[in-house]
Design a protein with these regions (language model features):
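Cytosolic, low-complexity regulatory segments enriched in Ser/Pro/Gly with interspersed Lys/Arg
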Residues: 1-28, 32
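C-terminal interaction modules of eukaryotic adaptor/scaffold proteins
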Residues: 11, 25, 157, 171-201
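N-terminal low-complexity tails and the immediately adjacent first alpha-helix
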Residues: 34-36
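Primarily EF-hand calcium-binding motifs
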Residues: 38-56, 62-67, 73-101, 109-123, ...
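HEAT-repeat alpha-solenoid elements in large eukaryotic scaffold proteins
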Residues: 53-57, 136-139
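Conserved beta-strand elements of beta-rich interaction domains across eukaryotes
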Residues: 61, 66-67, 98, 104, ...
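A contiguous pocket-lining binding segment that forms or flanks enzyme active sites
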Residues: 115-138
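Strongly charged, low-complexity linkers/loops
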Residues: 136-157
């Protein structure tokens, strides 16, 4: 039997490792996106991630294209952590779509839970002041020159202290999901801020 040429081998291995997503109807039934929206999202995903999966480095690169005036690396890492299943370092299309659906089209509780998971960096069920500082610093880095006046470490610390003390109602030094949910839903302004996720994503 003759050996396959190099192009045939590349095509074979490409087919072997390429991830195949679920059927369109199935994806539409488990997310809050229409079939047309899923097709549109998949086209963009496949163009940027032709193998059907994305690792953290690739995710950071893609994310940074939306924020050219700042450094999106750290914030993208935190977002990736909320999308990526525990113990893995890769996202397939279903996982990406499910997370996107939750953030963009989920209930108010879904959105609050996602925000909580973003700040709960070590996933222990609590947000510490250190974790909040890490994420807020990443947001400032992400926005870069768009922030005026330019903020320093002292600004970040003051911002975190003010917000943390508002949410940590029992003063035990950590924020729980319940405290986060109570704070986010206590007035209309906070709720409207969460509704902006519908258009941001």
């Amino acid at each position: 039997m003759a050996l396959a040429n190099e192009e045939d081998m590349e095509a074979f291995f490409s087919d072997v490792v390429r991830y195949r997503p679920q059927e369109l109807n199935q994806l539409a039934s488990v997310t809050k996106f229409s079939r047309r929206e899923i097709q549109h999202i998949y086209r963009g995903f496949k163009q940027e991630c032709p193998l059907g999966t994305v690792d953290e480095d690739r995710f950071k690169h893609l994310f940074s294209q939306f924020f050219p005036f700042g450094d999106a690396t750290k914030y993208a890492q935190f977002v990736f952590g909320t999308f990526c299943p525990p113990g893995t370092n890769i996202i397939n299309f279903e996982e990406f779509l499910s997370s996107l659906s939750l953030v963009a089209r989920g209930s108010l509780h879904d959105k609050i839970a996602w925000i909580f998971s973003l700040y709960d960096i070590n996933h222990d069920g609590f947000i510490t002041k250190h974790e909040m500082t890490e994420v807020v610093s990443a947001i400032y880095e992400l926005l870069g020159h768009a922030i005026e006046p330019v903020l320093d470490a002292g600004s970040v610390e003051r911002h975190v202290n003010a917000v943390f003390d508002l949410i940590d109602t029992n003063g035990d030094g950590v924020i729980t999901l319940d405290e986060m949910e109570r704070w986010c839903t206590r007035d209309e302004g906070n709720t409207k801020s969460l509704d902006m996720l519908n258009t941001v994503w």
